[in-house]
């Protein structure tokens, strides 16, 4: 059973609050970040997270669910083609709210809500066997690396010789002047 939210609503009526949250979510997906009040940022965050979670799997049902909230087809396309696939390995926490101080006119606390674009760091291995396997693959990768710098050093050797020759020529030119 739906329960009313406690305290004052954003914009006055529940319908106006829903419209405000829809517009904030749309602008967030279109621009990547939105500067708004802390209260609005905290209220739009769960809605944005829910929509991004739906956008991770591109199905007709998920597109219809998102279209109920965001009516602009261009923004829905951005959500499903850019933002959703980028969050594929992440299990929540798609947005970040950062406080930026107070607004000059009315001293309202302001915040920036943004879609996180950082890559997901690989998780730590769960067991000791996984840790050993990860270490083994890392050492194999390090053993393969020295071959490439040897080729680079051979390619850079003629360049270094040319630079030394140029320095010798410069020193020879300086001696007659002194």
UniProtKB/Swiss-Prot annotation:
Gene3D superfamilies tied to this protein: Ribosomal protein L17 (3.90.1030.10)
Short name of any one Pfam family annotated for the protein: Ribosomal_L17
Gene Ontology MF, one: structural constituent of ribosome
Keywords noted in UniProt: Ribonucleoprotein, Ribosomal protein
Region (Disordered) location: 123-178
Keyword Phosphoprotein on entry: no
Keyword ATP-binding: no
Low complexity composition bias: residue spans: 123-139, 151-160
GO aspect biological process, one term: translation
GO cellular component, one term: cytosolic large ribosomal subunit
UniProt xrefs under InterPro entries: Ribosomal_bL17, Ribosomal_bL17_sf
Composition bias, Basic and acidic residues: 161-178
Family, per entry: Belongs to the bacterial ribosomal protein bL17 family.
The protein's assembly and partners: Part of the 50S ribosomal subunit. Contacts protein L32.
Name of the molecule in the record: Large ribosomal subunit protein bL17
């Amino acid at each position: 059973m739906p329960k009313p939210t406690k305290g004052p609503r954003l914009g006055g009526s529940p319908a106006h609050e829903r419209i405000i949250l829809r517009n904030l979510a749309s602008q967030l997906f279109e621009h990547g970040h939105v500067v708004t009040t802390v209260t609005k940022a905290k209220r739009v965050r769960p809605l944005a997270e829910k929509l991004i979670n739906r956008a991770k799997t591109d199905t007709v049902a998920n597109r219809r669910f998102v279209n109920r909230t965001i009516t602009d087809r261009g923004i829905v396309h951005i959500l499903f083609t850019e933002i959703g696939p980028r969050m594929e390995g992440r299990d929540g926490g798609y947005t970040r709210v950062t406080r930026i101080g107070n607004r000059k006119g009315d001293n309202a606390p302001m915040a920036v809500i943004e879609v996180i674009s950082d890559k997901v760091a690989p998780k730590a291995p769960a067991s000791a066997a996984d840790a050993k396997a990860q270490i083994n693959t890392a050492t194999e990768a390090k053993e393969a690396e020295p071959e490439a710098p040897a080729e680079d050093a051979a390619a850079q050797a003629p360049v270094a010789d040319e630079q030394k020759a140029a320095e010798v020529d410069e020193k020879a030119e300086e001696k007659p002047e002194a």
